[in-house]
Amino acid sequence: MKRYLTILAAATMLSCGGRQAGYPVAGEDHTVKIASFEEFQSYFRYVPGRDIIISAHRGGMQEGYPENCIASCEKTLSMMPTFFEIDFSFTKDSVMVLMHDLTIDRTTNGKGRVADYTYEELQRFRLVDRDGNVTDYRIPTLAEVLEWGKDKVAFNFDNKYINTKGVGEAERRRALDYYVEQLLPGGAWSEYHNIFLSVRSLDEALYYWNAGVRNAMFCIEISTPEQFRAFERSGIPWSYLIAASRKAMDPAMTEIYEKLHDRGVMVIVSITGSADRVKDRRDRRVEYLRTLLSEPDIIETDYPADFVGLPVGREELRAIRDREAERMERSVCRAAGLPIACRAEIRRAASVRPESRRTPAGSSPRRECTPCRRRCGCVRSNGSSKAAR
């Protein structure tokens, strides 16, 4: 942890020395001007060397700023380029309001199911921030948020009705059909060009696609070769896909990531259930840096403001990673009492796949280091035999 704190400090200085964040489409005010769905697809098309995008889960959360609140979105956008994942629920009178849960218990100073209140009745309650502090903010409607974000930001719609416990089949179908109705020509969402849908399965994406939805992208989990092949056979063009990785850039999936990138598909990882859970802010930022160094294309987080000052540029991140690798190589050489020339051999050994490192029966596991003609990590320069630790 101490080593990563040192790297974090250096990374922050490096980030401050250049640009804060330079996404290709975001302007100086951090907004994204999108005039058509084609431009929206272009914004989410993978381009080598492009900066990592930080996504604000539920609009981003800070002290005094509740989740799924327009004021919270405004605050986050004032600090950095981003886009917003938002959730919504139906009221008793069929108004879509921003609300992650089916009840208002956790996020407001009220109690009860959203579906048991009319929109007007909900307006007497106030949203609370993550620490439980009551704010002055009311529950917004989805229509209000869409209008606020028009020509400004992108939105990721999360349809919680699809797999939420306690939701019946009739409610699920109603939510699916509501999406279709709103997105088809003439629907309330059809005039916007800044929406993609997080779907729980390829079948859900196909439900929208087969119903004629062509003005929204789909965020679908592709964490296995089987899921990759299933999407390839689906008939949905790759230009409509943002790939969600269940694990934060799993090395075992490198080949799949490369195939996705070859098709212009960005990979998003969510850290809301991992790094975001670290209580101490400094330690949390260390975990954020670890995630950045793994180079996903998009990171979804509850606390986007905590990424401010961290490097999101690929060149910056690779420079940090290279310096850390060099430091580790020097450390191994010093521990083994070997000349620094052995670093090249250590780097070569580190790049060999684990299966190729297995030693045939009866042979020595030690290998002569070309630069110094010694056994790397096994023999000190004074000739004494001692394994490097």
Regions inferred by a protein language model and the residue ranges of each:
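Sec-dependent signal peptide recognition
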Residues: 2-7
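Hydrophobic h-region of N-terminal signal peptides that target proteins for export
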Residues: 8-17
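Phosphate-group recognition and catalysis centered on beta-loop-alpha active-site segments
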Residues: 16-342, 368, 375-378
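Compositionally biased, low-complexity flexible segments
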Residues: 334-389
